[in-house]
Swiss-Prot record:
This is ATP synthase subunit c. One of its GO terms (molecular function) is lipid binding. It comes from Glaesserella parasuis serovar 5 (strain SH0165) (Haemophilus parasuis). The chain crosses the membrane at residues 9-29, 54-74. It is found in: Cell inner membrane. The keyword Transmembrane applies.
Length: 84
């Protein structure tokens, strides 16, 4: 039973790490493309900024969903019931 709990915690940690990595890479690409497009067409900067903030919110949702799934696995582990 301890191995299942340990494996679940390690899996949740890996899930959080990849979610944070994906969010960081997504924000880096998003910011770079926003600056590039604003420099190319400055008159569209306000429109692009609104769209950038919407996409940034969706990128943050990835990390929040990963936190929720990890908390589910850590505190309400569904795999322990399979051992009984």
């Amino acid at each position: 039973m301890e191995t299942v709990i340990t494996a679940t915690i390690i899996g949740a940690s890996i899930l959080l790490a990849f979610a944070a990595l994906g969010t960081a890479i997504g924000f880096a690409i998003l910011g770079g493309k926003f600056l590039e497009s604003s420099a190319r067409q400055p008159e569209l900067a306000s429109s692009l900024q609104t769209k950038m903030f919407i996409v940034a919110g969706l990128l943050d949702a990835i990390a929040m969903i990963a936190v929720g799934i990890s908390l589910l696995f850590i505190f309400a582990n569904p795999f322990i019931d399979l051992l009984k």
